[in-house]
Amino acid sequence: NNNPILISLILSKKVLGKYLYYTPRGPLLKKTANREEAYAFYLTEIKKYLKAKNAILFKFDPLIEYIKHDKEGNTTTEDNNQQFVDFLKKNGAKHRGFTIGYTDEAQFRWSYALDIKNRTFEDLTKDMNSRCKRSIKKAEKYPLMVKDVTDKTIKDFKDIMESTAERQHHGDRTLSYYQTLKCQLKDIIRMCLVYLDKEKFIDDINRGKYSIDEKVLDIIKNDERIMIPISAGIFIFDKNRFNYVYGGTYAEYFSLMAPY
C-alpha cells in the first residue's frame, strides 16, 4: 500500500575493484512495525543487492538502544535488546562488541542523553559532577563568545575539526561536506564557533583578573585576529531532541574550557 515501514541510506566506496557498503545509524524502522520480520526481509533483499554489486562488506549500525545506564556507566535495568542482537547474528551479522573510546568505527556505541524538560539550568547543574561544574565556571570567566557559522567563517570551522581529527587519529569530513550540511539542513542544524575576544582577554590578564600559561598567552598575542576561533560544534534538532553530533577544539586552548 506504498506505506514504508523501513528506510535505509546506503553509502558505497570502491576498493580495488570491489565495493564496501555502509548504512549509518540504520536502517530506521517504524514503531508499529514488527522489527524482526522487517529486518529479516531487509537483510534477505540487501544480500541479493550486494551480491549483484560485487560487494565485499556491508556494515550497518542500527539506532537501537541496547540497555540503559546511569551517568556513572552502571546499568539501571535488567531489560536489554540481547535477543535482537542474537537475531541479527543468526541472519549473518557479526557484532563487534561494545567498544569504548575512539575506534576505527564510524559511529560511537555509547550516547549520553539528558532530559531537560521542565528543568532550569540550575536544576541540571545539580546533577553534574564536580569536574563539569568547575569547567563551566572556569569558561564563564573568560571573554568567550558563541557565534553561528557563516559562509565566511566555515573554513575556520573546518580547520578546528581537522586539527581535532588529526590529534585524535580519526578521519575528518571535507570542507564541501560541511558546506552541504549547513546548506541542506538549514533550520534543523546549528554549526557553532566559540571565539576568544583577544583584546578583552589581554586586558583582563594585564589587570590581574586571572593568569594563563605563558606559551598560550604568546600564541594569543601573536594571532592577528581580534576574535580568535578556538572551538567548534555541530548540533542537530530531531523532533524532541537536540543532538550534539560532534565538535572540536584547538589543543593549545584546552585550558579555556571553550566547549563548556
Where are these predicted regions, by residue range?
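Acyl-donor binding region in acyl/amide transferases
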Residues: 18-104, 225, 239-260
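A conserved beta-strand-loop-helix scaffold within acyl/acetyltransferase catalytic domains
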Residues: 1-17, 65-72, 92-107, 111-255
